[in-house]
């Protein structure tokens, strides 16, 4: 590109120098104008050459920077956003080549639960999954997902505070996130979702990238098991192993599993204090008035669900 530009400029100068008739003199005005133009052209060529030469040097400097040692000890986190680029580089080099992309949502969840319900559950669950895998990290939670038609509204969009994406936007977001993580060096990229509306988009993205990547240096896996049968399996575990079962339904988009797991991250996001004050510290017949007991119940649920999901991830990654 640069050589063509220089050649074009040089050709122009040669033609201008050769054309000495009156028409040319009118164009340049006088010999001083011609010399001035020639100086400008030569300066442009010289500057272009200067700008082109540092490419190899810049690549060398970048390679040195990318290989530099950390100046301080590494921090500890399973969340990509809480790590430095050097820490991520070293973790990948040490074998942490699996990255989990968790998808949540912002939606209505009855009178007690914050709209970020799914995101709060993922905050507690994803690091547990990564720890059980032993070679994985968690990408930032994708907090915006399809929640219904925006205008006219449908589904959760009928309630204030819900944020919805179109299916196309959601899938485009996941495509770019997944491709970015592949570029970083992760070889197994895992999609999980805590909500039913997230599942088809993740399946579509996994299918598209599986075809386009063709297993060249990374693979993408949609692990539906986190949601289905992950939720149902967790409910069965709670009933059979812990002896806790709902005795009624209060009519809300809420249950003991959601509530207890949210409380592990932040009890106030289920309005624990306000419910205690109002005498409404229960859901579907199960009391949550003992904060310690409710949080411990949530931890057991998360432990089970994380183990269930980690097993599913191992299965797909090993195939």
Residue ranges and their predicted role:
Residues 6, 23-35:
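Bacterial N-terminal signal peptides that target proteins for export
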Residues 32-44:
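Bacterial N-terminal signal peptides
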Residues 11-21:
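Short, Lys/Arg-enriched N-terminal segments with co-localized hydrophobic residues
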Residues 7-10, 46, 51:
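Residues marking helix boundaries in flexible regions
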Residues 49-190, 194-319:
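Extended, histidine- and acidic-residue-enriched regions that form the cofactor-binding/catalytic faces
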């Amino acid at each position: 590109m640069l050589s063509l530009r220089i050649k074009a400029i040089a050709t122009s100068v040669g033609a201008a120098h050769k054309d000495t008739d009156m028409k040319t003199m009118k164009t340049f005005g006088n010999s001083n104008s011609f010399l001035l133009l020639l100086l400008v052209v030569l300066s442009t060529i010289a500057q272009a050459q200067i700008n082109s030469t540092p490419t190899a040097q810049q690549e060398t400097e970048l390679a040195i920077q990318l290989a530099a040692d950390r100046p301080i000890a590494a921090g500890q986190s399973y969340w990509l956003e809480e790590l430095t680029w050097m820490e991520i580089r070293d973790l990948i080099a040490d074998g942490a080549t699996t990255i989990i992309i968790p998808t949540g949502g912002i939606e209505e969840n009855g009178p007690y639960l914050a709209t970020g319900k799914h995101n709060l559950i993922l905050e507690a669950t994803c690091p547990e999954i990564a720890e059980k895998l032993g070679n994985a990290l968690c990408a930032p939670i994708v907090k915006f997902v399809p929640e219904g038609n925006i205008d006219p509204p449908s589904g959760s969009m009928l309630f204030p505070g819900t944020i919805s994406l179109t299916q196309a936007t959601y899938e485009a977001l996941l495509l770019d996130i997944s491709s970015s993580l592949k570029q970083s060096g992760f070889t197994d990229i895992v999609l999980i979702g805590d909500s039913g509306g997230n599942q088809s988009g993740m399946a579509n993205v996994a299918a598209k990238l599986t075809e386009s990547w063709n297993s060249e240096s990374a693979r993408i896996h949609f692990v539906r098991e986190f949601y289905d049968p992950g939720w149902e399996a967790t409910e069965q575990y709670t009933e059979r192993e812990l002896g806790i079962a709902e005795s009624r339904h209060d009519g809300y988009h809420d249950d003991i599993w959601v509530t207890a797991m949210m409380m592990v991250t932040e009890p106030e996001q289920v309005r624990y204090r306000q419910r205690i004050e109002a005498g409404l510290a229960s859901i579907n017949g199960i009391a949550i008035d003992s904060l310690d007991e409710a949080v411990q119940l949530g931890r057991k649920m998360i432990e089970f669900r994380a183990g269930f999901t980690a097993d599913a991830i191992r299965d797909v990654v090993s195939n």
